[in-house]
């Protein structure tokens, strides 16, 4: 731990999944304009990845070079599969979902709402079937029940990939069926197997879920970030940086921190009687969102995402590691969870991420942000999410990085409510422009006629002039280097836009 008389600079990075793009933008401002060189770094989940990579160097130039690597890797992501890779059992479940949905629809048309037989299957699930039912059930009854469970399983499956919407499905379920949510899915499949109608697909799904204990494995982005070319844990141990990675033990339920040496300490920085652990595994444990990624074994216990207990690990930095100048960068807003469209048809990952990384985290994070501010930290946080924890779109990632830069400038220099409103309107307008450009030019776009496309381009041109005025309302020292060019060009996309931006002068 640093012991000099100089200010002890600390950097605290929250969790946030794909939303860490905001943090990268904020860090660029802090390193390039403020000139920070933290000697203490703490992080949770995605923040643990960023912090651990930066912690390989103690000098400013070395840390800034690591940040440049993170920036490059983040901008190269193209889809949610870069961060979340489906396991075979879950991929099969998603593949078979539409078939089961169709069976459900046929059953509803033929027989109406699930009645007596649905109740019998529900009774079987809860182990409360009456003795008379058990002794008089026929093979035909079992077949009917199996078909109905198959259909009911389908009602709980959304076949969409993370962050891409949903596929067509049957009519919304009757109120009595609305409680059948993805959390009950595997239980339903197991019931189907019990009544003798499980095929190889269902066997693979059940056995895979029991064996893997998660729906996904970390995508290639994690391997890239932890590749020896980017990250070498020996450099962390030798750099002199004080590092704390937040993890939560499943067995004890306790919040722990892994240090730069791989040792384990409690929330008050007291050493625990555990052998040192591998730092790469500790980072993976800090990112192990329950159900999404499997728990990671560290020493004698299994660990999951540190955000389960502490999303913004500022308290240990400020109260126990001697930090006197603290910069805390939060990936998502702590002012409440924004309302989203209906989750009735969302896939399992979307529901888990919405509850664990947004709703639950918001409740915990509010108190942590209040504590950090009360203890004198400069807290940098967004007022809204440019994209959610699952969305990986290169254009939105770029906008979120720029938003982080602007918000860091506001936090550092101080900004009036009116100035913050300009930033908010500017970033929201860029997001709207990006969506309009996607609608007009993306290969999958519904826009086919040139005349319609030109009308959309005219609308985009008008929004670009609005963007120009907003950019000019932001003090120049708060803009990224290319900020004054934002209105002159197209936003970033994963495809080429075949026409030049006609609104921008040569």
Locations of the language-model features?
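Patatin-like phospholipase
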Residues: 1-44, 52-506
